[in-house]
Amino acid sequence: SGGMSTAIDELSNSYFHPLQHRSPEFATSVGLPGADQGTFSDYSPAGIAEDAELISSTLAQLDELTPVNDDDAISADALRERLGLQLELFEAGEITGEINVIASPIQEIRDIFDLMPTDTAEDWHTIARRLTSVATALDGYKESLLARVASGPAIPKRQVLRCAEQCDTLKDSASSSFHKLAETGAAVFPELADDLREGALDAQSAYGELAAFLRDEISPHATDKDAVGHERYQRFSRLFLGAAVDLDE
């Protein structure tokens, strides 16, 4: 907002600043220097509830502020739209134990490694640390899946089984992106080879355990219906399109 930082700018910063620590993946995806990228968010119900609490208090503070000019009003609207939707999804039970074959924690935890810097030994040391953190992240996620089974919304069985297949791919060294990543680093920094390979094996076995967990613990409680339903679809289309869509057109 033209050089001068407004109260709304400050609030926005006060939300995003702790986010880089609460969500190391966020720090990685926006390339924030100085944030620790060797770990993961807390994917458990408690961790997700804390995130929602931060969003909720930020929105409450936003309601107390008056934009000083047009730019400021645009900033406020953008923040309110983004955070309001996140909160709505959380309250509808959509964030806890989210599972699908494209953009759920199963893929996010895997894909974040593609965005990590790989130039220095320090970078690879961070990658090794994050590989050993995969199991903890997936344990939190399993708790959330069980919470979702207990309180809904229903989980489509087809998604569960296809996600289990994705986990199988990540488990086996022949196909695992974790294995390839470790070997790439080991070739450049032999002194980190042991840490990287150990981290990769940890991550692979964590995904192997998740595959079994999905088949044994979650699939029996999942629904054969894949339908999303009008209200849920509207929320998700807003999430991806950034606007409310008139679905009845």
Q: Which sequence ranges carry the predicted segments?
A:
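N-terminal maturation segment of proteins
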Residues: 2-249
